[in-house]
Amino acid sequence: MAKKVTVTLVDDFDGAGAADETVEFGLDGVTYEIDLTNKNAAKLRGDLRQWVSAGRRVGGRRRGRSNSGRGRGAIDREQSAAIREWARRNGHNVSTRGRIPADVIDAFHAAT
């Protein structure tokens, strides 16, 4: 019997819908990730804009925003779910949401 696992990322802020993107931001030396709908991601960026424009950039990437382009190509939700399922079956420790470690993604691609 085949088993199909579907993972749906839900907006972490209000839980009102499926998340469209993962937004990364930092404060006091701590980096955070939050899964948001496009509407809430735009609101977060808008709310932070005045603070960012008054601040100084001290590091980080100089790239345009993307959903998950980490140099390996974007991973869609179906592929992410498949990688997580493969990782668990093969003894890798992965969370149910958020970023999948690069070594797990590399191992998945090497095995498939």
From Swiss-Prot:
Residues 97-102 bind DNA. Belongs to the Lsr2 family. Homodimer. The lineage of its organism: Bacteria, Bacillati, Actinomycetota, Actinomycetes, Mycobacteriales. Pfam families: Lsr2, Lsr2_DNA-bd. It comes from the Bacteria. Keywords: Cytoplasm, DNA-binding, Repressor, Transcription, Transcription regulation, Virulence. It is found in: Cytoplasm, Nucleoid. The C-terminal domain binds DNA and the N-terminal domain is involved in dimerization. Both domains are essential for normal function. Residues 58-78 are annotated as: Disordered. InterPro entries: E3-bd_dom_sf, Lsr2-like_dimerization, Lsr2_dim_dom, Lsr2_DNA-bd. The keyword Repressor applies. DNA-bridging protein that has both architectural and regulatory roles. Influences the organization of chromatin and gene expression by binding non-specifically to DNA, with a preference for AT-rich sequences, and bridging distant DNA segments. Represses expression of multiple genes involved in a broad range of cellular processes. May coordinate global gene regulation and virulence as well as genes important for adaptation to changing O(2) levels. Protects against reactive oxygen intermediates. Dominant T-cell antigen and stimulates lymphoproliferation. This is Nucleoid-associated protein Lsr2. GO terms for cellular component: cytoplasm; nucleoid. GO terms for molecular function: acyltransferase activity; DNA binding.
